[in-house]
Design a protein with these regions (language model features):
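Short acidic/polar, Gly/Pro-enriched loop/turn segments located at secondary-structure boundaries
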Residues: 1-145, 158-177
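Short, conserved beta-strand element in jelly-roll/cupin
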Residues: 152-156
Length: 178
């Protein structure tokens, strides 16, 4: 189950002050502030211009941990782009399932989701879940905060909190969950 894997992985903490890319729970790669991590549809991973070799398996997840004072960019295999803020952890599969795309976030990201009506995109946090309908938006959901927020830039998203309350956002709207 994705939620169980994501929760387990986000309990791991960063070592030192470097941004860490954890590939398949095995290899830890330190990357420079502002570097872009790119996943291709063929399964290759690159940090900046450097390609990283690893075995791409659908049932394995990678994690990126960005410590305070740092930021990075992540391009997922489907072409969706994430700007990951300081103090953030993101857990995601190397390859998305054919009918569903989902990631887990503890912290803050700005995401521009590649539209694919056959495979909805979900951003899960400890406080809520966002169903993405081909859009760009910001999620701020740090574990220690009393509230979490979603700000929609374009497109549409459906929010569902832990009590199963739902809300649809339109562009330029903000939802705050406490």
């Amino acid at each position: 189950d994705f939620s169980v894997v994501a929760t387990k992985m986000t309990n791991e903490s960063a070592v030192g002050d470097d941004i860490q890319l954890i590939v398949s729970q095995e290899e830890v790669i330190s990357i420079k502030k502002g570097s872009t991590v790119t996943y291709s549809q063929s399964g290759t991973v690159s940090v900046g211009e450097e390609e990283i070799s690893h075995t791409a398996t659908e049932d394995l997840y990678d994690q990126i941990i960005v410590p305070k004072g740092k930021f990075t960019r992540l391009i997922l295999a489907d072409g969706s782009s994430l700007h990951i803020n300081a103090g953030t952890k993101v857990v995601y599969p190397k390859h998305f399932a054919k009918n569903k795309r989902e990631i887990f976030v503890d912290g803050e990201i700005f995401i521009d989701v590649k539209r694919d009506e056959s495979a909805p995109f979900f951003v899960k946090t400890a406080q809520f879940e966002v169903e993405v309908l081909g859009t760009a938006f910001n999620v701020s959901a740090y574990k220690g905060d009393d509230y979490a927020e979603v700000v929609l830039l374009r497109g549409a998203v459906n929010l569902k909190d832990n009590k199963k309350n739902t809300l649809k956002l339109s562009p330029n709207q903000l939802a705050s969950i406490s």
